[in-house]
Amino acid sequence: MQNGDLDFIEDIPCGTGVDNIEFDEVGNLWSGCHPNLLQFSAYAAGKKEIAPSEIIKIAYRGKNDYTVETVYLEDGSVMSAASVAAPFKNYILAGNVMDDSFLILKQH
């Protein structure tokens, strides 16, 4: 669809519920994700205690030229329902909207 301001290029299948997207210093996309949307919905409605968290990195080089990599995946016991992943130096800061803290993860 074209509205004069934006042209559609492509969809990128990620196999997870992508939430907020951030960029690193070289242009990779980072996102906090919900790998199980049914568990996330139940968690958001207060029907489950935890929901899994996932962080993905997308190296986008152009149309049909990208890689999607899971860099963090856990069952929600460390942090439920990650909604953002912000790279900073060799760290990733991850947060969600339900907790009053965020994670600091170190990349190796």
Locate predicted features.
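Structural signature of WD-repeat beta-propeller blades
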Residues: 10, 19, 80-83
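A structural motif specific to WD40 beta-propellers
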Residues: 7-9, 69
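Blade-level signature of beta-propeller repeat domains, shared across WD40, Kelch, NHL, RCC1
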Residues: 76-108
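Short loop/turn segments immediately following beta-strands, especially the blade-tip
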Residues: 1-4, 57-64, 106-108
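Short N-terminal helix-initiation segments at or just after the protein's N-terminus
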Residues: 1-7, 30-34
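Loop/turn-rich, solvent-exposed surfaces of beta-rich toroidal or solenoidal domains
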Residues: 14-73
